[in-house]
Regions:
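Bacterial N-terminal signal peptides that target proteins for export
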Residues: 2-12
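Secreted/luminal cysteine- and crosslink-motif detector
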Residues: 3-4, 24, 259, 361
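A periodicity- and composition-biased signal for non-globular, repetitive helical segments
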Residues: 12-13, 87
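Ser/Thr-rich, Proline-interspersed low-complexity disordered segments
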Residues: 23-130
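A surface/extracellular/periplasmic glyco- and lipid-processing/surface-interacting theme
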Residues: 106-178, 185-461
Length: 461
């Protein structure tokens, strides 16, 4: 009997070694770029059947203080992480002779690696001379002390239920807002998402906070900002790990967030600018960063009179259709979404026991604000389907390059100017020109960027 048990132990050990060897063969280590600075592996990226978009955040959290790429790194350096197993569905079967073997499942890194930016050491971009009290993101006067901070880039959901219930908070106080298609779906759940940039104002409430997408590693480095978000697919998280930015994933930074448990998962995760900045200071990540910013001018340009801009055509999702209407009295564009209904932002104070799923408690009277912008900029760029599975509905991530050059439409002061955008690297701001190649200046104030596919047709009036 003892002999039989011993043979069983030896056999089981042998099988275990074979399984481990097979797993190692399926997951080759990534080849770091020459400028990367390796460090000891930290907590592995959690795997799940779907990203935060499909299910609420897990309550099974790692110990506070564990990190997912949250260490601030100089531009040109990043920290590769060990590969993790993939929950992505297997690749389609290989085409060819009948009976040919199916292709091996694509790993997280195999799906994500083609979209990894070539971060390197670039010469510092000279910051234009401007008064210390002029916000480089808006061109407006601001408290100089507020400008000596790291910008926050918050991922904010835009599902129809969020707008219907007036759950948006903080958008009206952002300096910049980017709106983009988040996924390519063949079902009715497609929508857009916002990346809102906060520097000169500190909203008491920001939300609802949602998951990150691969577009974020292209916009956050130019701001040297901190990305405020909640989870994402394994492929997206791996890409964030290779990117020089402050990563404030809610999963690993629970004390910076709270929950309004009266809402569904699409609207319940919230934060405040004050709390995020307290968390940055505790971690030693808050600092003044040089921002090149945009060019601004009070002088209205010559252009085609346009008072209404609407995004209603496919592939823009029906649930996210939006119109901007020029208001001559204020000199701003008012946002309507869904069409015909003002898109409202709610401003109200909040108290919370931060972290570990703590409840958000709002205090005081809600103040609703109609979202507006001094500039609406439409950027045209490629939208490429990827193999990165983003949620349990098998929606795939969209690669939207924001470097290079492309067409642009600039709307300010009730006119449209056709032009171009250009950007050499992820660390640089966009440069805007009109159709004649002359620099184009934005109107001082808030700018909303609508990022659309090449050839997308706007509805203009």
């Amino acid at each position: 009997m003892f002999f039989s048990a011993r043979r069983w132990i030896i056999a089981a050990s042998t099988v275990g070694l074979l399984v481990l060897s097979a797993c190692e063969a399926e997951m080759p280590s990534p080849t770091p770029r020459p400028t990367w600075t390796p460090r000891a592996p930290a907590t592995a990226i959690p795997t799940s059947a779907g990203a935060e978009d499909a299910t609420p955040a897990s309550t099974a959290l790692p110990p506070l203080g564990s990190s997912l790429g949250a260490q601030p790194l100089p531009l040109g350096q990043t920290t590769p992480r060990p590969l993790v197993s993939s929950d992505a569905p297997a690749a389609p079967p290989a085409t060819g002779a009948p009976g040919a073997p199916a292709a091996a499942p694509m790993s997280v890194v195999e799906a994500a690696r083609p979209f990894l930016p070539k971060f390197g050491t670039f010469p510092p971009v000279p910051v234009p001379n401007r008064p210390a009290n002029i916000n480089p993101l808006t061109g407006l006067p601001a408290d100089p002390a507020m400008l000596q901070r790291r910008p926050l880039v918050a991922r904010i959901g835009n599902e129809q239920t969020v707008r219907t219930n007036h759950w948006h908070a903080g958008l009206s106080q952002a300096d910049l807002v980017f709106e983009e298609l988040i996924d390519m779906l063949n079902n009715a759940y497609a929508n857009t998402r916002f990346s809102a940039v906060f520097l000169s104002q500190d909203p008491a409430l920001i939300g609802p906070i949602r998951s990150g997408r691969i577009i974020n590693f292209q916009m956050v480095p130019m701001l040297d900002g901190a990305l405020v978000f909640s989870g994402g697919s394994n492929g997206t998280r791996w890409l964030f790990e290779q990117t020089p930015m402050i990563n404030l994933d809610e999963y690993y930074n629970q004390p910076a967030y709270c929950y309004d448990k009266t809402r569904g998962y699409q609207g319940r995760l919230l934060t405040s600018a004050q709390r995020i900045r307290e968390w940055l200071r505790q971690k030693g990540w808050e600092k003044s960063v040089p921002l090149y910013g945009f060019t601004f001018s009070d002088r209205a340009p010559s252009g085609q009179p346009i008072t209404s801009i609407a995004l209603t055509r496919a592939p823009w999702p029906p649930s996210s259709q939006v119109a901007w209407q020029y208001d001559s009295a204020s000199g701003k564009y008012l946002r309507y979404s869904p069409l015909g209904k003002p898109h409202l932002d709610v401003i109200h104070p909040i108290t919370a026991k931060w972290g570990n799923g703590a409840d958000c408690v709002t205090t005081g009277k809600d103040v609703e604000t109609h979202i507006s912008a001094a500039n609406v900029v439409v950027l045209y760029t490629r939208h490429e389907r990827t193999n990165i599975i983003e949620d349990a509905n098998n929606a795939v991530s969209v690669y939207i390059p924001l470097t290079g050059q492309g067409d642009a439409r600039f709307f300010r002061d009730g006119v449209m100017v056709q032009g171009k955008w250009q950007r050499k690297s992820e660390q640089e701001f966009w440069q805007f020109t009109d159709s004649a190649g002359n620099p184009f200046a934005l109107k001082p104030g808030v700018t909303w960027f609508e990022i659309v596919p090449i050839g997308y047709q706007l509805d203009l009036k």
